[in-house]
From Swiss-Prot:
Name of the protein in its database record: 2,3,4,5-tetrahydropyridine-2,6-dicarboxylate N-succinyltransferase
Record EC number: 2.3.1.117
Any GO molecular function: 2,3,4,5-tetrahydropyridine-2,6-dicarboxylate N-succinyltransferase activity
Originating gene: dapD
Disulphide-bonded residues: none
Gene Ontology BP term (one): diaminopimelate biosynthetic process
Pfam short name (any one): THDPS_N_2
Catalysed transformations (reactions): (S)-2,3,4,5-tetrahydrodipicolinate + succinyl-CoA + H2O = (S)-2-succinylamino-6-oxoheptanedioate + CoA
UniProt keyword annotations, A-Z: Acyltransferase, Amino-acid biosynthesis, Cytoplasm, Diaminopimelate biosynthesis, Lysine biosynthesis, Repeat, Transferase
Record pathway: Amino-acid biosynthesis; L-lysine biosynthesis via DAP pathway; LL-2,6-diaminopimelate from (S)-tetrahydrodipicolinate (succinylase route): step 1/3
PANTHER family: 2,3,4,5-TETRAHYDROPYRIDINE-2,6-DICARBOXYLATE N-ACETYLTRANSFERASE, ACETYLTRANSFERASE
Entry keyword annotation includes Ribosomal protein: no
């Protein structure tokens, strides 16, 4: 792995000249293909948790960006669609039954996953879009018309409901993608973007929009935080009233309660939201 990282880092330093050096390009393409395949298999990932903190592996982002720079678009076809892209689909008309059985995943028509996205066992993918660099851990459901952005990280046993947008990011290199930790529920038509972290066991109601500058308000105390939904929080959309009379209130999201891990396991999602 160290040699792979070294080659990517060296290529990044001369990225603007790569297309002018055909011999260097041939060697580099194999390195980049190996990097994308490592993402595909989940042996490397863009972002990972170390010592209770999430860290970005910038070299992986560089590998993805270099792959875009050095790869020409080509025509792809399946049984009902054609498209022209630099990134091959993870699954195509040529993917056989045994591949799906060995991966222990289920997909339905309209599920689009780009190569370089990792899909763990027992994941169900409804008609949706999962971009390169994304990581979907075991037992998660990606529901209908959800969008998982490039490099977004989704934990184990999550439910990403219909029409939800999970933001991704390739640049700037140091920026974290959206991270949804284990056992989270993201309600339908919600949008989580700009590197927000939703910690383990959190429940996000339907139609909640959270970016890096969205005020996250504890209902009980009035405390305001940004960029992070604490573990086992139950979150709904809300409005912060204006201090000045006659001025409009501003959108926020509200932590209406926090439950412990045991309660979260026992109580149905709908009961928590009510």
């Amino acid at each position: 792995m160290s040699s792979l990282i070294k080659e990517v880092e060296e290529a990044w330093q001369i990225k603007d000249k790569l297309l002018q050096d055909s011999s260097k390009l041939i060697t580099l393409k194999q390195t980049l293909n190996d990097s994308i395949e490592s993402l595909n298999q989940g042996t490397v990932r863009v972002c990972e948790k170390k010592e209770n903190s999430w860290h970005v592996n910038e070299w992986v982002k560089k590998a993805i960006l270099l792959y875009f720079i050095t790869t020409e678009s080509q025509l792809y076809n399946n049984n009902y669609n054609s498209w022209y892209d630099k990134v091959a689909p993870k699954f195509s008309a040529d993917t056989d039954k045994n591949t799906f059985k060995e991966a222990a995943i289920r997909t339905v028509p309209g599920a689009i996953v780009r190569t370089g996205a990792y899909i763990a066992k027992n994941v169900v993918i409804m008609p949706s879009f999962i971009n390169i660099g994304a990581y979907i851990d075991e037992g998660t459901m990606i529901d209908t018309w959800a969008t998982i952005g490039s490099c977004a990280q989704i934990g184990k046993n999550c439910h990403i409901s219909g029409g939800t947008g999970i933001g991704g990011v390739l640049e700037p290199l140091h920026a974290k993608p959206v991270i949804i930790e284990d056992n989270c529920f993201i309600g339908a038509r919600s949008e989580i973007a700009e590197g927000v972290i939703v910690e383990e066991g959190a429940v996000i109601s339907m139609g909640v929009f959270i970016g890096s500058s969205t005020k996250i308000v504890y209902r009980d105390t009035g405390e305001i935080i940004y960029g992070r939904i604490p573990a086992y929080s139950v979150v709904v959309p809300g409005v912060l009233p204006a201090k000045e009379t006659g001025k409009p209130g501003l959108y926020c999201v509200v932590i209406v309660k926090q439950v412990d891990k045991t309660t979260r396991a026992k109580v149905r999602i709908n009961d928590l939201l009510r």
